[in-house]
């Protein structure tokens, strides 16, 4: 069976973890990895796995005789903002793991079906991928007037980009909690925990609701957790409590350990979600092609 050909732009931790996940994909074949550092471990690993790897950037990628069907952007918002129009002009679908937000916010378990034809899809943030599904589930059955999330990640899993852009990621996640999950108002708080040994990603979702039906809320949350677990097996519900109109849900995310340590569930969930998006898009396209 034919598969979508993929390029990974960015050879750091995120890009390298993406590669290992894509190597297991039934529908997406990682063909290229692009970076800017010839000494990058990610590029070396990509070459070992048989990918065509280059430190010559996006110019090199777009000069290939055979272009990819999809590109995973694992660089920076500035880099993606500049490259996105070029991908679109070349007919390449872009899955954006940066804060650039060129395309719509996408969370596979919640709203991917609304954006199947989008040329550019933004993966929100690590915290967003973990918490938006839960708030969306609560909102669907209980009408959330307010949502607030607290995402705690291990210090070792927070690179320079995360640290420098923590406020930006939190603001973006808050916007997505309202836009995608549907809460009237929302706020996101991110915490970097220096504990040793490093802790797994932990998330708490609070929601104030208008229709506090505890049984319906619990069923909705359990169903959503099961849906996310289809592509993030280490996504676990730790607590759900409905106290009047206040709902509290606690989660833990353990990474798959493909490249990153298992405590880096915050990074694992966004790469797993990005691969899930590509798998769904590729499967849909490959099914439709024979009928054309």
Swiss-Prot record:
It comes from the Bacteria. SMART domains: Semialdhyde_dh (SM00859). Its EC number is 1.2.1.10. NAD(+) binds at residues 11-14, 157-165, 266. Keywords: Aromatic hydrocarbons catabolism, NAD, Oxidoreductase. InterPro entries: Acetaldehyde_dehydrogenase, Acetylaldehyde_DH_C, NAD(P)-bd_dom_sf, Semialdehyde_DH_NAD-bd. This is Acetaldehyde dehydrogenase 2. It catalyses: acetaldehyde + NAD(+) + CoA = acetyl-CoA + NADH + H(+).
